[in-house]
UniProtKB/Swiss-Prot annotation:
The active site is at residues 100, 200, 202. It comes from Schizosaccharomyces pombe (strain 972 / ATCC 24843). PROSITE patterns: GATASE_TYPE_1. The keyword Cell wall biogenesis/degradation does not apply. This is Putative glutamine amidotransferase PB2B2.05. GO terms for molecular function: hydrolase activity, acting on carbon-nitrogen (but not peptide) bonds, in linear amides; ligase activity. Pfam families: Peptidase_C26. The keyword Cytoplasm applies. Keywords: Cytoplasm, Glutamine amidotransferase, Ligase, Nucleus.
């Protein structure tokens, strides 16, 4: 059986292995893409895009200067790469899953803004606890929408590893998951092609059933894109080339 090809965008400092394992477990074939990939070099046959966690989105992307109270860990090359990947996905109607930073990237891409340091903006300091990545830091509440259907519950426990957070919502996006202190923790487009979560499901995929459900939903949407591409192109899909191997595209900055 052919599996959909998933472009996984990470930073050079990321540990991509948990994401790769989650994609494979859900039935996808991952391609790991690093910052610096040019728009005209995006693999043309990808069926889905995952924007992983990592450095903060540069505040100039949403019209702000650096907050002196916020960590200044940014990657402008990765920002540019992922903007190009989102452009590509929207043009091709490819599903996108944003995780932590990836969720924030999606929000800013569509014109939203971010809190640069949620712990200094009136939110309880539970969003970056000094705990292992799999530590369940707090609960989130799902409102009616695609994410609630995927997660299968109104309230779930999640981990939390972030400084930034969604402030104003991007155009065309809905905030359908919130933390118990009121911070947006999940976004989605009306058609379900764009999903973003603030937590790290790849780190708790063996601990919380809703994590695997999220990846399975995304892979199933990607499979649908793969099938549609095959129908309209009349060309066999190339995922057999990637099966049983993980392809990395390391582009130097």
């Amino acid at each position: 059986m052919e599996c959909p090809i998933i472009a996984l965008s990470v930073g050079f400092s990321n540990n991509s292995q948990p994401y790769v394992e989650a994609i494979i477990k859900a039935g996808g074939c991952p391609i790991v893409i690093y910052p610096g990939l040019q728009r005209n070099s995006i693999p043309p046959n990808i069926d889905g895009i995952i924007l992983a966690g990592g450095e903060s989105v540069h505040p100039n992307r949403y019209g702000e200067d650096f907050d002196p109270n916020a960590p200044k860990s940014v990657d402008v090359i990765r920002d540019s790469t992922e903007w190009g990947m989102i452009d590509f996905a929207l043009k091709k109607k490819i599903p996108i899953l944003g995780i932590c930073r990836g969720c924030q990237v999606l929000n800013v891409y569509f014109g939203g803004s971010l809190y640069q340091n949620v712990s200094s903006c009136g939110f309880r300091d539970i969003h970056r606890p000094s705990k292992p990545r799999h530590y369940l830091a707090h609960k989130v509440m799902a409102k009616p929408g695609k994410l609630k259907n995927i997660l299968g519950s109104n309230v779930i426990d999640v981990n939390s590893i972030h400084d930034q957070g969604i402030k104003t919502l991007g155009m065309g996006l809905q905030s359908t998951v919130i933390s118990d202190d009121g911070l947006c923790e999940g976004i989605e487009s009306k058609d379900g092609l764009i999903i973003g979560v603030q937590w790290h499901p790849e780190a708790i995929i063996d601990k919380q059933p809703h994590s695997l459900k999220l990846f399975q939903y995304f892979i199933n949407r990607s499979k649908w894109h793969m099938k549609q591409s095959n129908i309209f192109s009349n060309v066999p899909h190339e995922s057999s080339f990637y099966r049983n191997s993980i392809i990395s595209i390391p582009i130097a900055p």
